[in-house]
Amino acid sequence: MEKKFLKVGNNINFKFNTDGLEYDLIPGIVYNIIVDRYTDTVSLQESGKLPLPSKVYCTSRDERFIDKVINSYNLSESGFTGVMLAGLKGSGKTVMAKMIANKSGLPIVNIDKNIRPHILRNIVEMLGDTSVCFLFDELDKVLADYDDSFLLQVLDGSDTKGKHMILFTCNDDSEISEYLIDRCSRIRYWREFEEMSPSLIMEVLNDKLNDKKEVKSLTDFIKDNFEVCSFDNIVSFVKEANNYPTTTFEELFEDMNLSSKGTIKPHARSCKENNHKNVKNKLASDDYCWTVC
């Protein structure tokens, strides 16, 4: 099969001329789209592999969903297998998108907010029968300035010779075009991300909390007080708890960029009572100094 790309340094160009080395896109490698702002000429630039945390927290339901997406793509004959991962910010949507992209075994093309939809359509045309996984993070942030008619054309597959996967994430699905919702031919799978379950919270705490005796107490504190139980918020709070082992959960919470469900419900830490007294005495002194100053 004739190669469709040329590599010059780190840039991978569509084969419009004979300069450079012939090149095939590499499975698992991320390519950023480079667009000449004067000519709209498109090239791709290698960007390594998608970074993932050393440990990914994944439920059996998550694993079944990922396997289903991959299997459906493999069974498809042409066009796009579209996936929308929507919902709570900081809940792991981007991590799951990266996991799916890596598991697809396809070259990964990153679409950022600067790539206009007509450019995406042109890329799909130029790819021909070369299959890739497109990754479009936080789609909802760009749709206000985005002509989604081109995106709809792309997802309809009218210009597609090969078969592709396209992964979207969004925090606010109310911003998504009505022409994408309940249209499985365009977006086959739609997964809503909500708060972490108590069992998953406890698993994270068992891994990351230094004082394992506090796992149950901190799990209860999170369930009772966190307005947004996202992975991002929980991991950040655990770091604070590890860094300040004699500070109450309530004080840690009050000082962080976290919203509460209402009046904070205290839960005891496992540190010694005299440590609590020392902290309270220090806080009283600090508060007095702050007031006087």
For each predicted feature, which ranges?
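Pre-Walker A (pre-P-loop) alpha-helix and adjacent loop at the N terminus of AAA/AAA+ ATPase modules
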Residues: 45-83
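Conserved catalytic/switch belt of AAA+ P-loop NTPases
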Residues: 140-184
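Conserved ASCE P-loop NTPase core motifs with emphasis on AAA+ ATPases
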Residues: 22-55
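Hydrophobic positions in the central parallel beta-sheet of the AAA+
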Residues: 134-137
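C-terminal alpha-helical "lid" subdomain
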Residues: 1-30, 183, 190-293
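Walker A/P-loop nucleotide-binding motif
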Residues: 76-97
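Short glycine-rich substrate-engagement loop in P-loop NTPases that contacts/grips substrate
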Residues: 64, 101-130, 143-149
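Conserved nucleotide-binding/hydrolysis micro-motifs of P-loop NTPases
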Residues: 115-116, 140-141, 171-176, 195-201
